[in-house]
Amino acid sequence: MIRRIDMALHVQEICALNDIKVRYQSMDEIEPRYWANPNKREIQIRPTKNTGYYVSALHEIGHIIGDNQDLDRLGQELWAWIYARQTALVWTPTAERIMQDSMKSYDWQERDKNVWRLYSETMV
């Protein structure tokens, strides 16, 4: 079983190894506001208190060091999630739901879903 501390340390290690500055959003703020600035090699995430926050942090890291970040916005989002899936120590139904909800907000299409499915099948 992966513990919260393992997930938090994993995010910190990736950021340290890749010279990514991390800003932590206050937990007092109700609405999560994650973002990545590849030019500044900086991300904003919530403290890694659960799997959802963990995979969201990995997704933001994916915008900086993941593949295909030169695509259109939808492609960038998809490939940042692929990076998160590839890198995660654990991928749970919660992680999958968060990814699906995020991609729905970008109106992903069947071709994008097929890329995700193909990729996910290789991770099993």
Regions inferred by a protein language model and the residue ranges of each:
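Short, structured beta-strand-loop surface elements
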Residues: 70-72
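Short, conserved micro-motifs enriched in small and acidic residues
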Residues: 52, 56, 74-75
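An active-site-proximal "capping" alpha-helix that borders the catalytic cofactor pocket
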Residues: 74-89
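A short, highly charged nucleic-acid-interacting micro-segment common to nuclease
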Residues: 1-6, 84
